[in-house]
From Swiss-Prot:
Induction: Circadian-regulation. Expression is higher during the light phase than during the dark phase. Down-regulated by chilling. Its main location: membrane. GO terms for molecular function: water channel activity. GO terms for cellular component: plasma membrane. A motif (NPA 2) lies at residues 233-235. A motif (NPA 1) lies at residues 112-114. It comes from Oryza sativa subsp. japonica (Rice). Keywords: Cell membrane, Membrane, Repeat, Transmembrane, Transmembrane helix, Transport. The gene is PIP2-3. It is a multi-pass membrane protein. This is Probable aquaporin PIP2-3. InterPro entries: Aquaporin-like (IPR023271), Aquaporin_transptr (IPR034294), MIP (IPR000425), MIP_CS (IPR022357).
Length: 290
């Protein structure tokens, strides 16, 4: 069993908890001073570059798979159909693992507006940082997909540009539910992997936080690629839609923003008010008093 040294004792006016870890104080809603710090802009640049690389590798994988599995364009390879859905899922999950590992110490390794939104609701990041991250992630995604189109212009439009769309036979409600549940799994994993209590126990193995996050992305892709192509990342969906810019990319685009944001909000509430309720009560509750 995991080591958990928590001794509850009675004290005047309530209880206190002695523990082997400390919860960071809640981030301020608006921190104007943060705008004067280079560390913020360094983190924003890291989010931009990470999201650019994420979209470039993953969308290029999708386009390559569709080209290899197209019997009309590549009959020799059509029988083996390239990497397949499993390979696409590995590309998305593997890149998240790599990029979270590389950027966690600089920006926190969000690489996803839904993750940023969930952490903002949990008061892990300020509003200023959240807005700048989401802008950087969106621009990075657009640039990343733009590189794919530039390098593979012959195949990009022919194979759908890697854009998310609702598959035939599925209702909008089903697509929305798939995005909500998929994003919940991802953001729930992010909260669990970065929990201060877990970090205190596993800090000697720094790879442990990025690994489950990458696996969560991998597993969600296996489940939802047949339904929506798997969004769970509004920046990923926006970047592909902007560069592809066809009707089908925009027709149900709202699903890939509304679903992930709802899923992230539910995950934040579940983690903060159910799983970590005792820590919230015994922690910095005074910060919410006027």
């Amino acid at each position: 069993m995991a080591k958990d040294i928590e001794a509850a004792a009675a004290a005047e006016g309530g209880e206190y908890m002695a523990k082997d870890y400390s919860d960071p104080p809640p981030a301020p809603l608006i921190d104007a001073e943060e705008l004067t710090k280079w560390s913020l802009y360094r983190a924003v640049i890291a989010e931009f570059v990470a999201t650019l690389l994420f979209l470039y590798i993953t969308v290029a994988t999708v386009i390559g798979y569709k080209h290899q599995s197209d019997p009309g364009a590549n009959a020799a390879d059509a029988a083996c159909s390239g990497v397949g859905i499993l390979g696409i899922a590995w590309a998305f999950g593997g890149m998240i693992f790599i990029l979270v590992y590389c950027t966690a110490g600089v920006s926190g390794g969000h690489i996803n507006p839904a993750v940023t939104f969930g952490l903002f609701l949990a008061r892990k990041v300020s509003l200023v940082r959240a807005v700048l991250y989401i802008v950087a992630q969106s621009l990075g995604a657009i640039c990343g997909v733009g590189l794919v189109k530039g390098f593979q212009s012959a195949f990009y439009v022919r194979y759908g540009g890697g854009a998310n769309e609702l598959s035939d036979g599925y209702s909008k409600g089903t697509g929305l539910a798939a995005e909500i549940i998929g994003t919940f799994v991802l953001v729930y994993t992010v909260f669990s992997a970065t929990d201060p209590k877990r970090n205190a126990r596993d800090s000697h193995v720094p790879v442990l936080a990025p690994l489950p996050i990458g696996f969560a992305v991998f597993m969600v892709h296996l489940a939802t690629i047949p339904i929506t192509g798997t969004g769970i990342n509004p920046a990923r969906s926006l970047g592909a839609a902007v560069i592809y810019n066809q009707h089908k990319a925009w027709h149900d685009h709202w699903i890939f923003w509304v679903g992930p944001l709802i899923g992230a909000a539910i995950a934040a509430a579940y983690h903060q008010y159910v799983l970590r309720a005792s820590a919230a009560k015994l922690g910095s509750s005074s910060s919410f008093r006027g």
